[in-house]
Structures are given as C-alpha cells and as structure tokens.
A protein has these predicted regions:
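Helix-rich interaction surfaces within compact, conserved domain-sized segments
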Residues: 267-289, 294-296
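Short, solvent-exposed polar/charged micro-motifs at secondary-structure junctions
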Residues: 32-39, 251-254, 294-297
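Short acidic-glycine loop/turn motifs at beta-strand connectors
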Residues: 46, 254-257, 289-293
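A glycine-rich phosphate-binding loop feature that marks nucleotide/adenosyl-phosphate handling sites
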Residues: 28-34, 248-249, 286-292
C-alpha cells in the first residue's frame, strides 16, 4: 500500500469508528528543521481544541508488518490519552501582560530552519538559533507551546530584548534543569545509541551526563541557563565537551576524557542519521566549554 492510499485508509477507518458528530481532518504540519508531517486531527464538537497525531511514523509501522487494525487501535489510544476535556481559551496570547511569565526560549538549528526564522524573532548563538515560545503545557495534557512570531511581537508592542529578559527569568523556573547519568540512561532507553557511543569512548567508566530539562522536551536549551555549565564544570573538574544529542538534550563530559575527538563529529552525524528523528536534530559538531572564561566555542 502506497503512502497516499495508507492515509486514505486511516481516514476512512478512523471515521467509521467515531461518533457521527466527530470530524476528522488530515493536513500537513510544518515541524522543526523544515520537516513536514501529515497530522491527523480528531475534532470533538464540544471543545475548541484537538490533539494532532502525526501519521508518518505509523506508515513505517505498516511497512514493518504491523496490521492496519493494530495501527488504528494505537492511533485511537493516543487520541484518548490526549483528548481535550475542556475548552482552551487562546485569546490570552493577545495580551503580553498575560503571557509575560510564560515566555520561554528554545534552541534549534540555525542552518536547518532558515525559512522558519524569516518570520520569528531569534538570536544567533554558535550554530544555533534561540527562538521564543509561550509555554501552555500547564493548561494542556501534553507539552504545549505557541511560537512567538514577528506578527505576535508586533501585536504585543515589545522588542526582542523584552523577550530575552522574560525568557531568561521564566525558562529555568518553568522547565528546571535536569542532569542525568548518561550511561544509566542510555543502557535503559537507547541501547543502539549506547553501542555507537562505545565506539568513540569508554563511556561506562567516564563521568558523562545528559543535560536537559525536567520535561526532557526541548531541553537542549538548558545549556543557556545561568550558572548551569559553570556548576557542572566544577563537578567534572574543568573544561567540558558538549555534544548536541538532539533539540532535547546535550551530552556533557570532561574535555580531558579518553575520547577520540577526531572522530567525534563523524559519530554525531552518524547518530543523527540513525538514532535521531529528522525534526529533532540540533547540530553536527561538538563544542567546548572553557571553565576559565565561562564561554562555549
């Protein structure tokens, strides 16, 4: 079954399983790094919001031999996990005073998001772009944000500096830093990634950590939290290697570790192509944190 036929089958079969007053749409959704996914939206007429379920991964399930019935069950299960239970009033976004304490920043690839960056306020940082969002995760059953666009900034009547100040105060408070032992995490969650990492260094015996946030979502921005890198450098004994594992986290280790730095960039590219979703790739090279100057390069 080709992809277009798969989408039609999903739409037809899901519609047949819903009550008559429900509506279903499939539409393209722009994601990070210029990726476009097909989003399934199941609309309950009682509420003004609905979760978006991306169908592209389910097609890979189908190609791997998973039955259509099992895929339909999984899609409906996902919908039930995130279906709305009340209306969501988005009008508060029109008033900056109501969202000022919800402004956060996120780190994304600069090169891979050139088209998106034309319409949003951002700051260039190394090979990344710092963009700004309104965090609405507290009001929704999933990690929810609304990207701050140039149009929204104009509506608020503020400048980028105001966004920066608000986000620096809010992001560490809303999404506190989380530092996780990498060996323990990868052995449990990502054995494939762990095996690839062993080809570069003996990470089982080295002090290496995952730097993310409390939600482990869009957590790579935690490297920007005031004092986080300097504090971690004291723990690790000096300068550090920073590896952009994905938009969700950085891997951090001592610079003087027994690690093959020459092959590290090649390793990052390989992991990006095999273990990280296209829309979650952050960077393709490593960085160094200088503990004496408190800078990253």
């Amino acid at each position: 079954m080709k992809y277009t036929e798969f989408l039609h089958t999903i739409e037809t079969e899901i519609t047949a399983r819903l009550d008559n007053d429900f509506k279903l749409t499939i539409h393209p959704v722009k994601k990070n790094n210029g990726m476009i996914y097909d989003g399934l939206v199941i609309i309950n007429p009682k509420f003004n919001i609905a979760p978006t379920i991306y169908l592209n991964p389910y097609y890979h399930w189908y190609l791997d031999g998973v039955s259509i019935d099992s895929i339909l069950d999984a899609i409906l299960s996902t919908y039930n996990d995130f279906k709305p239970t009340e209306d969501f009033d988005i009008s508060f976004c029109d008033d900056f005073s109501k969202v000022k304490e919800k402004i956060i920043f996120q780190l994304i690839s600069y090169d891979k998001n050139q088209k998106q960056l034309k319409d949003v306020p951002y700051i260039k940082y190394l090979d990344f772009a710092i963009i700004f969002e309104v965090y609405v995760g507290a009001e929704l059953p999933e990690f929810g944000t609304i990207t701050v666009t140039d149009a929204l900034l104009s509506r608020w009547g503020i400048d980028t500096e105001t966004l920066i100040r608000a986000s620096i105060q809010n992001t560490p408070r809303i999404l506190p830093c989380s530092i996780i032992n990498m060996a323990e995490f990868l052995a449990k969650k990502c054995p494939g990634y762990a095996n690839q990492m062993r080809a570069v260094c003996d990470f089982d015996s080295l002090p290496m950590y995952i730097l993310t946030n409390s939600r482990q979502t869009n957590g790579a921005s935690a490297i920007l939290y005031p004092g986080v890198l300097s504090s971690l450098a004291k723990k690790l004994g000096g300068n550090m290697l920073l590896i952009p594992s994905s938009i969700h986290e950085f891997l951090v280790m001592p610079l003087d570790s027994d690690i093959d730095v020459c092959n590290l960039s090649e390793f990052i590219c390989e992991v990006n192509s095999t273990e990280v979703r296209d829309e979650e790739v952050l960077g393709e090279r490593y960085y160094i944190y200088d503990s004496k100057t408190d800078t990253v390069y």
